[in-house]
Swiss-Prot record:
Gene Ontology, cellular component aspect: cytosolic large ribosomal subunit
A GO biological process held by the record: translation
Keyword Ribonucleoprotein: yes
Cited function: This protein is located at the 30S-50S ribosomal subunit interface and may play a role in the structure and function of the aminoacyl-tRNA binding site.
Assigned protein family: Belongs to the bacterial ribosomal protein bL19 family.
The UniProt record lists the keyword Ion transport: no
Pfam hit, one: Ribosomal_L19
Protein name: Large ribosomal subunit protein bL19
Superkingdom of the organism of origin: Bacteria
Classification via InterPro entries: Ribosomal_bL19, Ribosomal_bL19_CS, Ribosomal_bL19_sf, Translation_prot_SH3-like_sf
Entry keywords, A to Z: Ribonucleoprotein, Ribosomal protein
Gene: rplS
Length: 145
């Protein structure tokens, strides 16, 4: 039974998602369908929570829009999420940043981690295509022998 669940989850799991953490400022690109057209809409904010694992993993992004705090929950493996860009990384000492809900202005700022390389979405795509190509070459060479 457990094996069957893993097979179904593997079918829907996304591989090309950047490894972001709590406190990171991210830009989530969401697919919006309007009539027969599809477009991408960016939602930029701070990751205040990550929960679940596997295909059920979700995260909450909080931003301030026109002076009002707005939080949105995203499922990491949702087909509506195109990709996630990491804008900046912050130094935090908590697993959940729910206390930011009560902070306003400068008190809600997080200290930025300096000297940390921020991965880009294009680098991730290059790495996954290179890994897939090398895996395909290994399969071809092993089947040729």
């Amino acid at each position: 039974m457990d094996q069957q669940i893993r097979l179904v989850e593997a079918k829907y799991k996304k591989e090309a998602i950047l490894p972001f953490e709590i406190g990171d400022t991210v830009k989530v690109w969401v697919k919006i369908i309007e009539g027969d057209r599809e477009r991408l809409q960016a939602y930029e904010g701070t990751v205040i929570s990550i929960r679940g694992k596997g295909i059920n993993k979700s995260f909450i992004v909080r931003k301030i829009s026109y002076g009002v705090g707005v939080e949105r929950i995203f499922l990491l493996n949702s087909p509506r999420i195109d990709h996630v860009d990491i804008i900046r990384k912050a130094k935090v000492r908590r697993a959940k940043l729910y206390y930011l809900r009560n902070k306003v202005g400068k008190k809600a700022r997080l200290v930025e981690r300096l000297g940390v390389k921020i991965p880009k979405h294009s680098d991730l795509i290059k790495n996954t295509t290179e890994e897939n190509a090398s895996a395909a070459e290994e399969n071809n060479s092993s089947s040729a022998e």
